Amino acid sequence: MAQGTLYIVSAPSGAGKSSLIQALLKTQPLYDTQVSVSHTTRQPRPGEVHGEHYFFVNHDEFKEMISRDAFLEHAEVFGNYYGTSREAIEQVLATGVDVFLDIDWQGAQQIRQKMPHARSIFILPPSKIELDRRLRGRGQDSEEVIAKRMAQAVAEMSHYAEYDYLIVNDDFDTALTDLKTIIRAERLRMSRQKQRHDALISKLLAD
């Protein structure tokens, strides 16, 4: 069985990466593609469900997991911790399922060091004006928080060149098509096709 591919997806807050990933998953069967559910110490936002969007834990629980080396990556963002379970990711990949990680550039660097075969995708907004509009459209944050998020977005975007692929999310449908194209191309790589069609290739080359 061909090993699944781990996809690292990063973007500044408001660029639409979560929406793109969710839209992609709706077009892919569960036995092909799944999204990693991270642990976090931040409070749930309206509509977020424990175990579906995140595993919400307190700081003591998170630190205990760090001490057990339970995370493939972890980072602090805006005073909250986020981490990805090492065991959960490796188990899913072993079944041939592709896994998507929605993480920031700090987590991406940690993942690439531990899993160099992972593929990484960075998503950019079409402009700062549009990014500001999207951040304000949530209607959840104060001006101070929005300013902080915009500054963080600029810092995040400065790492775009560290990734394998770049998508500009101007038109959502076009960006989604770009994301699907990346996945399709990766599945057609020689290394994965040789594993997937090993029996066929052996028969075709037999005397």
Swiss-Prot record:
Q: Does the keyword Lyase apply?
A: no
User: Is Plastid found in the keyword set?
Assistant: no
Which top class of enzyme applies to this chain? transferase
State the SUPFAM superfamilies in the record: P-loop containing nucleoside triphosphate hydrolases
Q: Which GO terms describe its cellular component?
A: cytosol
Q: Which reaction does it catalyse?
A: GMP + ATP = GDP + ADP
Which UniProt keywords are given for this protein, alphabetically ordered? ATP-binding, Cytoplasm, Kinase, Nucleotide-binding, Transferase
Pfam families assigned: Guanylate_kin (PF00625)
Any one GO molecular function term: identical protein binding
Location(s), subcellular: Cytoplasm
Chain positions recorded as ATP binding sites? A11, P12, S13, G14, A15, G16, K17, S18
Q: InterPro entries, from UniProt?
A: GK/Ca_channel_bsu (IPR008145), Guanylate_kin-like_dom (IPR008144), Guanylate_kinase (IPR017665), Guanylate_kinase_CS (IPR020590), P-loop_NTPase (IPR027417)
**Which residue range or ranges hold the Guanylate kinase-like domain?**
4-184
- Spell out the PROSITE patterns in the cross-references: GUANYLATE_KINASE_1, GUANYLATE_KINASE_2
* The protein's Enzyme Commission number: 2.7.4.8
Please give the family membership noted in the entry: Belongs to the guanylate kinase family.
SUBUNIT field: Homotetramer (under low ionic conditions) or homodimer (under high ionic conditions).
Extract the PANTHER family matched here: GUANYLATE KINASE, GUANYLATE KINASE-RELATED
Q: What the protein does?
A: Essential for recycling GMP and indirectly, cGMP.
State the name under which the record lists this protein. Answer: Guanylate kinase
